[in-house]
Amino acid sequence: MASNRNWSQHSSVPSFAQMLKKNLPDPGTSPAVNQTSTLSTCCLYNQPDCGTARVTRITGNFPEPFLSKMIVPPSLSSLTPRKVTKEFMVKYRRGDLNPISALYQFAQMQRMEIELKETVTTGNVFGAYFAFCAVVDGLEYKTGMGQNKKEAKANAAKLALDELLLHEDPALIDSENQSLNVIENPPPLPMNPRGTTETSTISRTRTDKRTFIHEKISSIIKETFTNLVSKYPEYENCGSSLAAFVIEKGGQHWEVVAIGTGEFNYGQSLQSDGRVLHDSHAMVVARRSLLRYFYRQLLLLYSGNNGMMDKSIFCTEPATNLLALKPNLNIFLYMNQLPKGAAQTNPQLCLSPHSLSAHEANDKLSLHVSVEGKNIPASYYSGEIVHNLYSMSSTDKLTRWEVLGVQGALLSIFIQPVYINSIIIGNAACSDTRGLEIAVKQRIDDALTSRLPMFYLVNRPYMSIVSSTHLTNNDTANKTLSLNWSQGDACVEVVDAAIGRTVEGSPFKSGSCLASRLCKAAMLCRFNLVVKESKRNAIPSGLSYHEAKRLAGPYQEAKCLLNSYFKQQGFGSWIAKPPIIGEFTM
């Protein structure tokens, strides 16, 4: 291990095994001593580097009872792992630590055996590329590639450490993930498990436990949606596009807090009253329903009633006026289909950026605009769409949430960024999440974290596939309909995505104008109510929707950095909606 080599370089004292070998008499004249490599390794690992040492001559003529009672030091894997420090996590997330150094430090803290070994490149990558993978306690992790060995090793170390950090001590994460948003679950099984070591068995057990939890979450979502539409069977087939947010409390309790369905977006002429719902894709609808849930939780906290305040998911944080999620809370996003856009790209195409299909791969990974159910590269459009309102693809929005959080600009005035811990796909036709991982994780480098404002980071959610809550269907009867629900709602609201307003037969209707409870005007109304209840006197009254969003300075800064990053990396420009749609007031 690297720690052994480092110790040897900084100390001139010979190891116990070296002294033993030098001082033992010839085997023919004295009893033989059985030496093991384990003894040398463990002595080096446990001996402190104090700069001085007392060397005692060893004869090797030990009495038989001494040899029979000689204790072999334990292997590294049997030593008690130390907790990973908050300082280490912060430095690694911000890019202050070299990935190789960070991996070896992590291995030392967790008492793991580690090796970086050279392997073969993945995919049809042409050219002089080197490939390495990390082997940790006998488990082989994903392959890292580079134009030189140093780069390949660094990429391999980073891939391994990113997975290893997913199964940190839950107690550590519960107390510290408010600033790091580290996932408390164990990592997925590495691609190529080696051997049948005890560590492999433990990893499989932990992963099986997480799979069981995700399957349980899927069944809870199915039950919740079925109950919501039980009185309205005509909307049951809308569940084929279902998306939902679930909050995990204490690792043992799960609550469905937001649901959305839909596959279309509004593409008609511009309206500036804030009462039209522009994007009705399931994931986006579920997220806007989640915002309504957050507003309810803020009102609980600001109610002044101790019983209601205790029920809120938010709590105050020292040294900041921004609220944070309470400890032991995790957020899961379930989707019955892969989101439209780059996530549906062939993963083999993405893994071969230097092949003949490189242009096609870049085109697939670029930002996309959703137009009438189809996704078109954003590079085909100008920086702002004036006449018709189109939306960015669901995959691009999900990627953005992994940097900015799911809370949006208005809520960022009250709370810290809220990140998704796990993404669960229930699509029976989806065999792996590789395409989604490439689109969401690999398009943005961790190094961006160091440039982001405080509390913002590049989040890395865990992804898995579970049983689908509802089978997909090609029924066109309700193709443009979108359902939404948030915890606390008495019934679902049904929106016609083509016109961006509630249908006449919807179980819930907010008024005669048929504006959805998810529209911008409704969100601004809730924002004004929270401003009043929180007694934020510094926030002026009568702000327009656009003016209120501009008050979230750090959020807007992070948003600008991310948009610039997309453009610099060749993914295209984020298409902005005309400012006029946010100039309404309440």
Curated annotation (Swiss-Prot):
Annotated segments matching region Disordered: 183-203
Key word Flavoprotein present: no
Boundaries of every A to I editase domain copy: 258-584
GO cellular component: cytoplasm; nucleolus
Subcellular location: Nucleus
Keywords: Developmental protein, Differentiation, Nucleus, RNA-binding, Spermatogenesis
GO terms of biological process kind: adenosine to inosine editing; RNA processing; spermatid development
Pfam families (alphabetical): A_deamin, dsrm
Domain DRBM: start-end pairs: 98-166
InterPro entries: A_deamin, ADAD1_DSRM, dsRBD_dom
Molecular functions per Gene Ontology: double-stranded RNA adenosine deaminase activity; double-stranded RNA binding; tRNA-specific adenosine deaminase activity
Main location class: nucleus
Function of the protein: May be required for male fertility and normal male germ cell differentiation. May play a role in spermatogenesis. Binds to RNA but not to DNA.
Record-stated family: Belongs to the ADAD family.
Name of the protein this chain belongs to: Adenosine deaminase domain-containing protein 1
